[in-house]
Design a protein with these regions (language model features):
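Hydrophobic alpha-helical transmembrane segments of multi-pass integral membrane proteins
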Residues: 1-247
């Protein structure tokens, strides 16, 4: 839908469709992709799966929670909020989405349930997700600054949470030390830098040195990514050397 809107905007000179492209392609597609997958990943990484004792905390019955129809309807409603975001009903759509995100964070992400796994990963997953939930209530309250505040989602969700998931996959599939995700100070530093970059970018519009703040945020995030790559290359190399000796 986002690409189709861009086609109308570019090839048919219909500039009003550019807003739909912007919202549907740049926001909705990545949002739904990441957090749709996250519905399974986030509870698994923190060991707060709905199949555990946390089921007693949830609003939905097990039958409704496992219903594909319910989540299809939920997803369509969620998508509709993005469509209406590009219209005069922007504020209303942002409020509805904020409520849907709050519901999703409770029922699917199990964000407010006791986590059985403690450590670096659990702390930062919850920190990023709490910030994203709060951010969705800031969007309608400060809609005139939405393009800046949306970086709470871009940096916290698309960067921070994706790196957490990538790191977990590497640790699991490459049989690295599982304690890395529990007490690694380097990983803690990396995710702290990303969180600093998040707020540096989201609040850049508040200061006179706007462009400098964009540079600070970009540089901080870039340093975090480089450290992340070096960290896992180093551990993968050690793992490879150990495997070679065992052969």
């Amino acid at each position: 839908m986002g690409v189709l809107a861009q086609v109308f905007a570019v090839f048919f000179n219909r500039s009003e469709f550019f807003l739909y492209y912007h919202v549907l392609y740049l926001y909705a597609m990545f949002w739904i992709l990441l957090f749709g997958v996250g519905t399974k990943f986030f509870p698994m990484l923190t060991l707060t799966t709905p199949l555990s004792d946390n089921r007693k905390y949830q609003i939905l019955s097990k039958k409704v929670y496992n219903s594909h129809l319910f989540w299809y309807i939920f997803s369509i409603l969620f998508l509709v909020t993005f469509i209406f975001e590009a219209t005069r009903y922007q504020i209303l759509s942002l409020w509805i989405r904020a409520i849907l995100v709050l519901f999703l964070s409770y029922e699917a992400w199990c964000l407010y349930f006791p986590a059985q796994r403690k450590g670096i990963y659990t702390f930062f997953i919850k920190l990023f997700l709490y910030t994203i939930v709060i951010g969705h209530f800031l969007f309608p309250l400060f809609s005139e600054h939405k393009q800046h505040l949306y970086h709470i989602l871009f940096v916290g969700g698309y960067l921070g949470l994706v790196l957490i998931v990538v790191g977990r996959v590497l640790i699991s599939h490459e049989k690295l030390d599982l304690t890395l995700e529990v007490k690694s100070k380097i990983l803690a530093t990396i995710f702290t830098l990303i969180y600093i970059a998040l707020w540096t970018r989201a609040t850049a519009y508040l200061v006179k040195t706007y462009e400098n703040h964009l540079k600070y945020a970009s540089l901080t995030a870039l340093i975090a990514i480089i450290l992340f790559i070096i960290f896992f290359i180093n551990h993968l190399h050690k793992r490879y050397k150990t495997s070679k000796k065992e052969l």
